[in-house]
């Protein structure tokens, strides 16, 4: 035991209350339920990250034991790195409301600088009337597992969310689309995934891939062919 975490039942603030931080207990590093979930994570090669303690408890009650939650904080790079050491795939599960989409976008942003080629991050956005607790009670564990297994990959979620924010139906929209994609592409550490996303962004923005690379000030590690004399 390195600390305690509490969650208000019903209305009240603060929603989450944790022990004071110490050298052993830092919220930005710890995940609720990770110790209990480790065996299931190793078995499934997948970990599901939900927003709250009670979501973890409800999922475990229905036999889904590979779920963890942050300690009332936003996802950090420390969380992502810790989970990637445990699993091949992270599924971030958020409510489908505006707050959930904001939290998902933050999780995507911090994942880009930690996700290597060969690992997977997915995003499962529930319908606005559900959180993981209510969904698994209403639809059952198998439905939740199926949704987690087929959740949107980071690449798909990133590009579709950018296009939702900046529709690419006009030149101005495409300009905003590229401008918002730029810092995300630049922070990626997975060169193969980065190149594929660069191509997707260029296609949607109706730009030549090399022109986009130049505009973003990026270099890609492409194999070069040597001309024979």
Q: Residue locations for each model-derived region?
A:
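Phosphate-handling DNA/RNA-contact segment within nucleic-acid enzymes
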Residues: 1-86, 90, 104
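A charged alpha-helical hairpin associated with nucleic-acid processing machineries
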Residues: 38-47, 74-90, 94-229
């Amino acid at each position: 035991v390195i600390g305690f975490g509490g969650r208000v039942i019903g209305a009240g603030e603060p929603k989450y209350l944790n022990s004071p931080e110490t050298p052993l207990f830092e919220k930005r590093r710890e995940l609720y339920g990770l110790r209990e979930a480790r065996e299931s994570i190793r078995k499934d090669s997948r970990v599901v990250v939900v927003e709250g303690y009670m979501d973890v408890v409800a999922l475990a009650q229905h036999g889904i034991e590979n779920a963890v939650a942050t300690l009332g904080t936003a996802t950090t790079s420390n969380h992502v790195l810790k989970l990637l050491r445990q699993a091949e795939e992270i599924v971030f599960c958020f409510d489908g409301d505006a707050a959930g989409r904001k939290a998902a976008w933050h999780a995507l942003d911090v994942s880009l600088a930690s996700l290597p080629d060969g690992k997977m991050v997915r995003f499962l956005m529930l319908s606005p009337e559900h959180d993981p607790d209510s969904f698994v009670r209403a639809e059952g564990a198998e439905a939740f597992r199926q949704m987690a297994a087929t959740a949107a990959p980071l690449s798909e979620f990133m590009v579709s969310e950018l296009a939702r924010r900046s529709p690419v139906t006009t030149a101005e929209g495409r300009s905003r689309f590229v401008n918002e994609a730029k810092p995300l592409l630049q922070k990626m550490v997975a060169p193969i995934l980065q190149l594929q996303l660069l191509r997707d962004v260029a296609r949607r923005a109706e730009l030549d891939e090399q022109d986009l690379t130049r505009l973003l000030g990026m270099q890609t590690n492409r194999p070069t062919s040597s001309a024979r004399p």
